[in-house]
């Protein structure tokens, strides 16, 4: 009896996993041609903001790929994933370097995640670091890379990533920090925004942090070599 219940439970778990993957697959298929209105990360952020202020709202406005500054595209590629155009979702060299760096430090100080992996996490997953989440992130990344063009992946990424406390996407970020549009960002502004991506809420409050300024200068120097889809 116990053995029978075990196998039934296992079968049910497998069915639920398959259904969840199918649900993700259908969302990605829809987003090939349609723009996401929100993401898991955006919903979690809004929920946190509304705990303190029930009337809180996110700053977010979708903008088409061609209306995003080429400087911002180059800056983000240079900062987050220099091999984005060439890899298939995973930068194995980057992952190895991040692992070695984290091992030496004895804690997680580098992620090694590609733009595609970051998008997978932002669209569907929680911020908790668990083996299951990393496995699911890999599966979603694989789906994204095979169902979408690099340009589409990058367009969605630039429109849904967090750029400050309640600030999501390139258009909202450009208006929040520089009172301009995403299409009008110059080289220095783009480099500064790209430098903020790993810790946007902190840099929203510390916009003149030395680390941010130093990183922005490095990104600006690398932008000319960035390959954009």
From Swiss-Prot:
Its EC number is 2.4.99.28. InterPro entries: Glyco_trans_51, Lysozyme-like_dom_sf, PBP_transglycosylase, Pep_trsgly. It catalyses: [GlcNAc-(1->4)-Mur2Ac(oyl-L-Ala-gamma-D-Glu-L-Lys-D-Ala-D-Ala)](n)-di-trans,octa-cis-undecaprenyl diphosphate + beta-D-GlcNAc-(1->4)-Mur2Ac(oyl-L-Ala-gamma-D-Glu-L-Lys-D-Ala-D-Ala)-di-trans,octa-cis-undecaprenyl diphosphate = [GlcNAc-(1->4)-Mur2Ac(oyl-L-Ala-gamma-D-Glu-L-Lys-D-Ala-D-Ala)](n+1)-di-trans,octa-cis-undecaprenyl diphosphate + di-trans,octa-cis-undecaprenyl diphosphate + H(+). It is found in: Cell inner membrane. GO terms for cellular component: peptidoglycan-based cell wall; plasma membrane. Keywords: Cell inner membrane, Cell membrane, Cell shape, Cell wall biogenesis/degradation, Glycosyltransferase, Membrane, Peptidoglycan synthesis, Transferase, Transmembrane, Transmembrane helix. HAMAP family: PGT_MtgA. NCBIfam families: mono_pep_trsgly. Belongs to the glycosyltransferase 51 family. This is Biosynthetic peptidoglycan transglycosylase. It comes from Methylobacillus flagellatus (strain ATCC 51484 / DSM 6875 / VKM B-1610 / KT).
């Amino acid at each position: 009896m116990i053995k029978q219940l075990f196998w039934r439970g296992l079968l049910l778990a497998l069915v639920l996993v398959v259904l969840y993957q199918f649900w993700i697959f259908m969302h990605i298929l829809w987003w090939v041609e349609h723009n996401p209105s929100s993401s898991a990360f955006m919903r979690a952020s809004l929920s946190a903001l509304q705990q303190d202020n029930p009337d809180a709202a996110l700053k977010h406005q979708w903008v088409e790929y061609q209306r995003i500054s080429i400087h911002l595209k180059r800056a983000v590629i240079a900062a987050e994933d220099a091999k984005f155009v060439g890899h298939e979702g995973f930068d194995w060299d980057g992952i190895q370097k991040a692992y070695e760096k984290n091992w030496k430090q004895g804690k997680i100080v580098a992620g090694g995640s590609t733009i595609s992996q970051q998008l997978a996490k932002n669209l569907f997953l929680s911020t908790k670091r668990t083996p299951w989440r990393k496995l699911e992130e890999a599966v979603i990344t694989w789906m994204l890379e095979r169902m979408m063009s690099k340009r589409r992946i990058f367009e969605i990424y630039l429109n849904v990533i967090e750029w400050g406390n309640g600030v999501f996407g390139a258009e909202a970020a450009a208006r929040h920090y520089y009172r301009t549009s995403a299409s009008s960002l110059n080289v220095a502004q783009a480099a500064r925004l790209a430098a903020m991506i790993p810790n946007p809420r902190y840099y929203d409050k510390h916009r003149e942090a030395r680390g941010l300024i130093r990183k922005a200068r490095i990104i600006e120097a690398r932008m000319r070599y960035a390959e954009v889809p």
